């Protein structure tokens, strides 16, 4: 079965990468789908930059690909024959946010959502938190893939 891991991934974190790696072990193909989040401001990275960083960060995973989509997620799953969505959960707050969307997606097309619990070492890690730390010169190594940490640091150095 093919699966999709949707998100804004601005930027992809080691927590995201952990979820994708675990999903890749369970599904024949996993697409990391970079989506626009209407609740978030325009990102640190363009969609194209995010996709490049994700490709570099997942190059070791043969059954993982990267794509983008700007419409209903279930339209993508239908168009590409994908039967599963994979979402990582850090806390009950993530569950409360994701549950209604999972139920609506199932109602619309029958696609199932699989929730994977985040590894405890990444339970507090978010793209937003990593950007905040990096913006003020903090160390984001160990939170982001190495190539991503370098790109984030460079972005913020160029803004000062």
Curated annotation (Swiss-Prot):
Q: Where is this site: Transition state stabilizer?
A: 16
What does the record give as the reaction this protein catalyses?
(R)-4'-phosphopantetheine + ATP + H(+) = 3'-dephospho-CoA + diphosphate
Q: Which GO terms describe its cellular component?
A: cytoplasm
Q: Does the keyword Transcription apply?
A: no
Q: Which GO terms describe its molecular function?
A: ATP binding; pantetheine-phosphate adenylyltransferase activity
Enzyme class, top EC level, equals transferase
Q: Which cofactor does it need?
A: Mg(2+)
Principal subcellular localization: cytoplasm
GO BP? coenzyme A biosynthetic process
EC code(s) of this entry: 2.7.7.3
Record keywords, A-Z? ATP-binding, Coenzyme A biosynthesis, Cytoplasm, Magnesium, Nucleotide-binding, Nucleotidyltransferase, Transferase
Q: In which pathway does it act?
A: Cofactor biosynthesis; coenzyme A biosynthesis; CoA from (R)-pantothenate: step 4/5
Signal peptide boundaries: none
Write down the SUPFAM superfamilies for this protein, in alphabetical order: Nucleotidylyl transferase
Q: Which amino acid positions bind ATP, per UniProt?
A: 8-9, 16, 88-90, 98, 122-128
The record's Pfam families line, in alphabetical order, gives:
CTP_transf_like
> What is known about what this protein does?
Reversibly transfers an adenylyl group from ATP to 4'-phosphopantetheine, yielding dephospho-CoA (dPCoA) and pyrophosphate.
Family label: Belongs to the bacterial CoaD family.
According to the record's subunit comment, the protein's assembly and interactions are: Homohexamer.
Q: What is this protein called?
A: Phosphopantetheine adenylyltransferase
> What gene does this protein come from?
coaD
């Amino acid at each position: 079965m093919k699966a999709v891991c949707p998100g804004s991934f601005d930027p992809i974190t080691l927590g995201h990468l952990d979820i994708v790696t675990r999903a890749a072990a369970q599904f024949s193909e996993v697409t990391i789908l970079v989506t626009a989040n209407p609740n978030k401001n325009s990102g640190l990275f363009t969609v194209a930059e995010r996709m490049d960083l994700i490709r570099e960060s997942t190059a070791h995973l043969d059954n993982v690909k990267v794509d983008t989509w700007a419409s209903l997620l279930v339209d993508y799953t239908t168009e590409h024959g994908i039967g599963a969505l994979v979402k990582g959960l850090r806390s009950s707050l993530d569950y409360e946010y994701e549950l209604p969307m999972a139920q609506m997606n199932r109602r619309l097309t029958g696609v199932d959502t699989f929730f994977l619990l985040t590894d405890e070492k990444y339970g507090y890690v978010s793209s937003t938190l990593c950007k905040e730390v990096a913006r003020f010169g903090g160390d984001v190594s160990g939170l982001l893939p190495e190539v991503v940490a370098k790109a984030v640091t460079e972005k913020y150095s160029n803004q000062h």
